[in-house]
Amino acid sequence: MGSVSNQEITEGLPKSLDGTADIHKSDKSVIFQGSGVCKWFNVRMGFGFLTMTKKEGTDLETPLDVFVHQSKLHMEGFRSLKEGESVEFTFKKSSKGLESTQVTGPGGAPCIGSERRPKVKGQQKRRQRGDRCYNCGGLDHHAKECKLPPQPKKCHFCQNPNHMVAQCPEKAMQAANLEDQPITEEQELIPEIME
């Protein structure tokens, strides 16, 4: 089922003398109702396209693409759409095509949104091992919510109860391996910048 992105919607727009829609001379703020699904949405850039399957409650023979910007989404927090998410929206005809003016979930509910978040340059990924219970080592909770009684103390790096992290041979071995790696050109420049 393909979609037509440049197809004009002329219903409800004033007609010129020759009977065609007079988009350029009319008030461009005519608002229409539509519903459909999110075709795609770029979370980093904050925009995407909706595939409109109904206009003013009537099924369309050929689905239409409608531009959507994150500022038009009705939801809390980080605004985005998930591919295939059902939406209801208002839209208008602009010089660039069809453009949404407000987007909600079905029945006016807030949009669900994408689980994806934009990658930020320079931000390192959080270590998986850092988000675990210090009491039992479980990944689904922290020590204050741990249902087990206090466990014997153990190394936080390798979980061995025979030593603490300060004397951990695995951590010392990992640090030694990092020292043996060749220094990159960027790392050589760091001392010069610091001076």
UniProtKB/Swiss-Prot annotation:
A zinc finger (CCHC-type) spans 131-148, 153-170. Belongs to the lin-28 family. Residues 118-127 have a biased composition (Basic residues). The CCHC zinc fingers interact with the GGAG motif at the 3' end of let-7 miRNAs precursors, more generally they bind the 5'-NGNNG-3' consensus motif with micromolar affinity. The CSD domain recognizes the loop at the 5' end. The flexible linker allows accommodating variable sequences and lengths among let-7 family members. The gene is lin28a. This is Protein lin-28 homolog A. Zn(2+) 2 binds at residues 155, 158, 163, 168. One of its GO terms (molecular function) is RNA binding. One of its GO terms (cellular component) is cytoplasmic stress granule. Its main location: cytoplasm. Keywords: Cytoplasm, Endoplasmic reticulum, Metal-binding, Nucleus, Repeat, RNA-binding, RNA-mediated gene silencing, Zinc, Zinc-finger. Pfam families: CSD, Lin-28A-like_zf-CCHC_2, zf-CCHC. Residues 98-127 are annotated as: Disordered.
